[in-house]
């Protein structure tokens, strides 16, 4: 289903190295011509220092098995440059005792003072570490790169011209080494930096757009990600505005997160509003499924869209791991919505709405009742499901109120900040004539 594939869009907002997992994922699908896809991977990997990956891709394209002369020369140059950079940071590597001291590492000034006192540390060593980290990353040695990037974050001042690059590099390296806990910490650190930096409006919008795309990789792989993606994308006005302005296709991932997060059903109402607002700029089976179900109450349409959703998710690298969960929770949403309208339902009717056989539908409902997720009774003789009342719990009501107030508070804070900046700018402009 190439018409709903987002890889070509998502890759525009990802670092070159972060695109490789997405492109390799597509190689296992029948969406695009395999030859053209491998040729694109080869052209992309040539722009890095990943010589082995380049040779592997050439073999997959049935090109010459022997390493071309330019690659032989590039490999020699890479090894020589690595050796030179490693020699430049050698004084830092002698400071292993300090690097292992957690208390010293917590305080940047104490750490730098100890390095200067005991190891004759100079700022030139810091920039050598930065260059080595970047070079290791370009070579695909992400794990080793993170060590030097971490060192740079501790020593480097936030005002340093390379500080933002280090934040981005650290996040990318942690994602590529699948260190999701650390990646989440780096994501939070980077978001705080972007939100508090003195960027122009356009620069801030661009930075947030990139961060949104990178964060999807983290959120769908971290245990807390399903809550955090909703908080960031739906309830932080600056990021919701970035999605609506620059990347409405991210609605797919926000919608998926809400569907598979049963504890955040209160977010559905706010999500549906945004989906309706953005329906003229972006639609796909996942957003249309929610529209069919909660706006039009079109159960037949929702059933058909759910079938399309499975194909979309199966071919989307970001959310493919959520496929079974999505189908299960989407069926539950259809069932719950249908039950709000009908107090008594035949199992055959329900099976039709859920794309299931009658005996499968009956077993599915029995499991829901057994797991205390459904207040209902089954009349096996008549083949009916009789619903009980399902009031919203006090906890769910409280969470819904808190989310609503939080969103309004952030919106007001953003409005006040913008007005304050505008007022200060007007004050500055008024002095230009004196």
Curated annotation (Swiss-Prot):
GO biological process per UniProt: formation of cytoplasmic translation initiation complex
Predominant cellular place of this UniProt entry's protein: cytoplasm
Pfam families reported in the protein's UniProt record: eIF3_N, PCI
Signal peptide boundaries: none
Gene Ontology molecular function terms on file: translation initiation factor activity
Localization per Swiss-Prot or TrEMBL: Cytoplasm
Keywords: Cytoplasm, Initiation factor, Protein biosynthesis
Domain named PCI: residues: 219-392
GO cellular component: eukaryotic 43S preinitiation complex; eukaryotic 48S preinitiation complex; eukaryotic translation initiation factor 3 complex, eIF3e
InterPro entries: eIF3e, eIF3e_N, PCI_dom, WH_DNA-bd_sf
Assembly with partners or alone: Component of the eukaryotic translation initiation factor 3 (eIF-3) complex. The eIF-3 complex interacts with pix. Interacts with mxt.
HAMAP family (alphabetical): eIF3e
Family: Belongs to the eIF-3 subunit E family.
Function description: Component of the eukaryotic translation initiation factor 3 (eIF-3) complex, which is involved in protein synthesis of a specialized repertoire of mRNAs and, together with other initiation factors, stimulates binding of mRNA and methionyl-tRNAi to the 40S ribosome. The eIF-3 complex specifically targets and initiates translation of a subset of mRNAs involved in cell proliferation.
Protein name in UniProt: Eukaryotic translation initiation factor 3 subunit E-1
Phylogenetic placement of the source organism: Eukaryota, Metazoa, Ecdysozoa, Arthropoda, Hexapoda
